[in-house]
Swiss-Prot record:
The gene is hslO. This is 33 kDa chaperonin. It comes from Synechococcus sp. (strain JA-3-3Ab). Residues 1-17 have a biased composition (Basic and acidic residues). It is found in: Cytoplasm. Belongs to the HSP33 family.
Length: 320
């Protein structure tokens, strides 16, 4: 399920921007249970993380919404991992012009991501929405890699359902992990900034009656205006109260910080250069007078000077 509101309606987001400031809520994640513990809930605000991705990659409107949804989805999945160093990798590879969507998120609340064609823009749908499904493509696969921190990651894949991201994540959870789930993802933006972004994941606990599945979906439908509500200043707790307040909602006190973060650094780039071999580095010194590398996940540019390359070659010669 995806936010069917102003998050994809450009006219409406402009109207909102004239009367209200963007959400000032810091990015965070909370957990809860409902229906006497039979439903587990994760909710998050990812506004600043998505805005940073938009700025770093110079994303178009539709690319911002697509990547923003995927970033929130990966964070929701990572929230249920057990070890702090555990991570989730999402890859959505459809037949649309956006190309692939790649996201890496950790149980620690860090997230990064990129799309293959960040500048792509498409006409709005007849309902004046950004056409994320058309941009991603309705034919292709969602790949989910889970690294639980034990050195043996495992991957599963399902066919895309709609390319809208939320539907595809729900289908993955129900078919691959066999956990009945309802997912709501939203990104609200205007020409200047991401006004609000986030998501909610509801899942049945083991042993819970199947009759709660339509109940979960109906409850999430109450907050289809999810991202505009965040843009207006509503908090996650208030939003969860709207859809689950009368169903024995219990919100955990822990609040986890969410942030865009990439592990790349100059030392890693130099390590990758060493893998090219001494002869290749000598050729770089002669022809390019240095080296340049760009991290795909965060678009950070690393420039390695000629002197630094010579130092690397000298180290390799001294320690063959």
């Amino acid at each position: 399920m995806t936010d069917a509101s102003g998050s994809e309606r450009l006219k409406r987001t402009k109207d909102i921007s004239e009367s209200t400031p963007p959400s000032s809520l810091p990015d965070h994640l909370i957990r809860a249970t409902a229906a006497e513990g039979k439903i587990r809930v994760v909710g998050l605000v990812s506004t600043q993380a998505v805005q940073e991705a938009r700025e770093r990659h110079k994303l178009s409107y539709v690319a911002t919404v697509a990547l923003g949804r995927a970033m929130s989805a990966a964070l929701l999945l990572a929230a249920n991992l057990k070890r702090r160093q555990a991570r989730i990798n999402l890859q959505l590879k459809g037949n649309g012009p956006l190309g692939g969507i790649y996201v890496d998120a950790g149980m620690d609340g860090t997230v990064r991501g990129y799309v293959s064609n960040p500048a792509i823009e498409l006409p709005l749908t007849p309902e004046s929405k950004l056409d994320v499904g058309q941009a991603v493509g309705r034919y292709g696969y969602l790949h989910v890699l889970r690294d639980l921190g034990y050195g043996q990651p495992y991957t599963s894949a399902v066919e895309l359902v709609s390319g809208e991201v939320g539907d595809d994540i729900s289908y993955y959870l129900s078919s691959s992990e066999q956990i009945p789930s309802a997912v709501l993802l939203g990104v609200n933006l205007d020409s200047q900034r991401v006004r609000a972004a986030g998501g909610v994941l509801m899942q049945l606990m083991p042993g819970a009656p199947a009759s709660l599945i339509p109940e979960m979906e109906a409850r999430l439908a109450k907050v289809e205006e999810f991202s505009p509500m965040l843009a207006y200043g509503g908090g996650l707790r208030e939003l969860l109260q709207i859809c689950l307040g009368d169903l024995d909602l219990k919100i955990a006190p822990e609040v986890r910080t969410i942030r865009f973060y990439c592990q790349c650094n100059s030392d890693r780039v130099k390590g990758a250069l060493r893998m090219l071999g001494r002869d290749e580095l000598i050729d770089m010194i002669r022809t390019d007078k240095g080296a340049e590398a760009v991290c795909q996940f965060c678009n950070e540019v690393y420039r390695i000077s000629e002197d630094e390359l010579r130092s690397i070659v000298a180290e390799m010669s001294a320690n063959p």
